[in-house]
Amino acid sequence: MIIKRREYMRIADYSVTKAVLDRHGFTFKKSFGQNFLTDTNILQKIVDTAEIDQNVNVIEIGPGIGALTEFLAENAAEVMAFEIDDRLVPILADTLRDFDNVQVVNQDILKADLQTQIKQFKNPDLPIKVVANLPYYITTPILMHLIESKIPFQEFVVMMQREVADRISAEPNTKAYGSLSIAVQYYMTAKVAFIVPRTVFVPAPNVDSAILKMVRRDQPLIEVKDEDFFFRVSRLSFVHRRKTLWNNLTSHFGKSEDIKAKLEKGLALADIKPSIRGEALSIQDFGKLADALKEVGL
């Protein structure tokens, strides 16, 4: 039986967090990027943003001592929380002892066999959402690992460094726009839901965070001939942001007369000026460019 605890002190209440850490003699490891949230209003806002209810399973990454997990467990059908730090497993067993709908998996999410793990949900056919406070140092690898997996996650509501959230959700012709924006938005819509100040964490990080909501598209935003080549072209177009598209392309593909002739032909086919910068191209433009370059033999 799940015990609802809305009327009690929360794990995220500062006094409770401190008591839990003291009781277990826990010390933070910088290598794991550990910053524990101590604001219950923000935690409730995260759950509301993710629209968690009893018809949804949740995957959480980096539960810490269970502050967000507690809120998720009260609302979701089931929560599967991946925690890489062995020391936190007994703490989570303590703080979440009143919930029978939480599974703590002591494993690196990047190494987990997610296809097998999600079958461990009591009702694996329910939609799955990812809700997490992601470690700053490994945010992008985790996101891309999950997005590119064959698991149909319905949406992601994740906390990350504000700068990274801005880059992911950025539009063309902005300073934040780049290959990361394209890589995520190809698969998902992305929007910053709200900002989280650094002052509500223990220990406090050096920068503010943001909650990013990403919803999986039914189909990728565009259709391309070769996805790997499309992502490769988008990445190389931002290697030197101040350089023109032509300079970035020739730096990568080469500057022989044959290569330059193919690049000129490909750019003409895509109706893209060589003098433009990558940040001015939409995802659709990059799709046309990649297909055209593929067509001319690059």
UniProtKB/Swiss-Prot annotation:
Transmembrane segments annotated in the record for this chain: none
SMART domains per UniProt: rADc
InterPro entries noted in UniProt: KsgA/Erm (IPR001737), rRNA_Ade_diMease-like_C (IPR023165), rRNA_Ade_Mease_Trfase_CS (IPR020596), rRNA_Ade_methylase_Trfase_N (IPR020598), rRNA_adenine_dimethylase (IPR011530), SAM-dependent_MTases_sf (IPR029063)
Pfam families noted in UniProt: RrnaAD
Domain of life according to the entry: Bacteria
Record keywords, A-Z: Cytoplasm, Methyltransferase, RNA-binding, rRNA processing, S-adenosyl-L-methionine, Transferase
Compartment annotation: Cytoplasm
GO cellular component: cytosol
HAMAP family: 16SrRNA_methyltr_A (MF_00607)
Name of the protein: Ribosomal RNA small subunit methyltransferase A
Species assigned in the record: Streptococcus pyogenes serotype M12 (strain MGAS2096)
Taxonomic classification: Bacteria, Bacillati, Bacillota, Bacilli, Lactobacillales
